[in-house]
Amino acid sequence: MNVRFGSPLSRGLRLLDRLSEPATAHAHCDIPCGIYDPHLAQIAAHTVVRMNQLINDLGDAPGPGDKQKNDAWHNSMARYVAVKEEHAELVKKEVRIIWGDYFKPEHLEKYPELHTIVWNIMKLGSKARQTVDMQAAQDLLAEVQKFAEIFWATKGASTQRQPSRQTSGGEIVYPA
């Protein structure tokens, strides 16, 4: 084996690399797998709505006189807030992946409102993390649903809204 030039196999592979132009990879995981779906963003937005419902249903903290009830209330509140924040950030992450890796200039030409929808999702996702605001949570879900409808339209699929059958209520956008 010639150390300077490598094995015949490695020389052959280098030659192939020089003769063929590499293709560009386009996918959220950069493999490319080509798998994109706004469903997870919708479920995460429903979770943000549900956590707001649970926080509102929790009511006011009990007085310091009953340690067990007070501890249980604070435990529940901490868990609801943590899950609300985690899922609001998950909405933003999933939308950023599709926005950055899937959508192309031709999609934006056809759906110029997409910029505003994504911007709204980012702002509402932050607001949902920072506050207990049912309206912000509902608005986040509505914007994610608009995003999902445009996403499926770019794939040539019509959409339908179906009851979510989740405890948060509302609907989920599915490709028809």
Q: Where would I find each of the regions flagged by the language model?
A:
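Alpha-helical segments in soluble extracytoplasmic regions
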Residues: D66, N70-V95
